[in-house]
């Protein structure tokens, strides 16, 4: 378990941060009722969006089946990432990237279980570009983790000895 500490610490941090920001913005600031709060207009606006699909509302559906399929997919990806980390025991950068995905995925699963949809509230626009989409801390985390896994988590050599053997 200690070998995977970066994975678990990152996933836990992201999950807690995601859920705390949602409680503060959606519940305490009552964004679910108000709908929009201009923080630093237009650069940062809290705009409530209930996402029943994946990124940008793709594959959204109001049926219970859609919700459960998306929960199952998120949990399957989470399980696969944990299995991969346990099997390969990669370095901390890859574990942190996987932890970003795991924490974000679980945060969005919790939303689907509590609200029936993912609570998206961050909206950023700039320089005449009006962004029509809202997102949340979990979405940012999943994106950054996926980028890290793609660019750092390949099947390249794990140690200097492996690199010498490969050349």
Enumerate the predicted regions with their spans:
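Alpha-helical transmembrane bundles and membrane-interface segments of multipass inner-membrane proteins
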Residues: 1-167
């Amino acid at each position: 378990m200690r070998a995977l500490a970066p994975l678990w610490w990152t996933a836990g941090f992201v999950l807690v941060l995601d859920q705390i920001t949602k409680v503060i913005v959606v519940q305490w600031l009552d964004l679910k009722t108000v709908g929009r709060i201009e923080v630093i207009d237009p650069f940062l606006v809290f705009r409530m969006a209930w996402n029943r699909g994946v990124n940008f509302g793709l594959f959204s559906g109001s049926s219970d089946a859609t919700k459960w399929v998306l929960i199952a997919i998120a949990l399957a990806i989470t399980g696969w990432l944990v299995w991969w980390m346990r099997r390969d025991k990669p370095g901390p950068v890859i574990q942190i990237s996987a932890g970003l995905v795991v924490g974000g995925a679980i945060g969005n699963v919790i939303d689907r279980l509590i609200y029936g949809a993912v609570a998206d509230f961050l909206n950023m626009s700039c320089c005449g570009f009006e962004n029509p989409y809202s997102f949340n801390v979990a979405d940012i985390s999943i994106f950054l983790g996926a980028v890290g896994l793609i660019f750092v988590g390949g099947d390249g050599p794990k140690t200097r000895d492996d690199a010498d053997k490969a050349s």
